Amino acid sequence: MFQKVEGIVIRTTDYGETNKIVTIFSREFGKISVMARGAKKPKSRLASISQLMTHGHFLIQMGSGLGTLQQGEMISSMKEIREDIFLTAYASFIVELTDKATEDKKNNPYLFEMLYQTLHYMCDGVDPEVLSLIYQTKMLPVLGMHPYFDTCAICHQETDFVAFSVREGGFLCFRHAEQDPYRIPVGEAVHKLLRLFYHFDLGRLGNVSVKDETKRQIRTVLNTYYDEYCGIYLKSRRFLEQLDKFQI
């Protein structure tokens, strides 16, 4: 049976001398993996459509196991991302997180739209670090994680947040911050932005400007929380940390 799907390539794996296994996150079926025969050959009609982060329409011969990619029609090559090492690093983080967080053939149109919007915002020049933080925040419920971003994790009051507690699973107000000796001190902007990132419609994203220190604190909160409750290892995250460390 042949199926035409709209999707974004989120992973490629070389298979033999000339073939690739291409993982596509599709609007219709969620994550699907297909064999792209001959895609490693420079003159192959599948060479360009099977590149990482390519957005396109794919004609797939579906089966009980691995499908076969027959042909594709490119919508966007994400050229702006490919030509910039920073954009490539952040986009790689986003697609790898999507891959690791999802199961095969689980339809999720909301997640497809979020992935599509994030990558296209990146191509349009929106701060890639902020976009990656938004995406990482919005992936929390997809992974079954629901931290307290709206109220204190202990007293459940909406007031004066001064720290984030991984142990308690959310923000702490000034009255209860001392209860966790391993709390992460945060500024007021961190709470406001994380709550915003968690709830707002990504399609309504306008001009965004976040201070470097605020981004650093948000990244610390999210990474620490993911490490404790998620257990997903991302190679792309390590590369981002190296970029930041060496300020390439």
Curated annotation (Swiss-Prot):
Q: Provide this UniProt record's keywords sorted from A to Z.
A: DNA damage, DNA recombination, DNA repair
Which superkingdom?
A: Bacteria
- GO BP term (any one): DNA recombination
Tell me which Pfam families the record gives. Answer: RecO_C, RecO_N
InterPro entries assigned to the protein according to its UniProt record, in alphabetical order: ARFGAP/RecO, DNA_rep/recomb_RecO_N, NA-bd_OB-fold, RecO, RecO_C
Q: Which GO terms describe its cellular component?
A: bacterial nucleoid
Cell membrane in keyword set: no
As for what it does, the entry says:
Involved in DNA repair and RecF pathway recombination.
Q: Which PANTHER family match?
A: DNA REPAIR PROTEIN RECO
Q: Which family does it belong to?
A: Belongs to the RecO family.
The record's annotation in NCBIfam families points to: reco
Q: What is this protein called?
A: DNA repair protein RecO
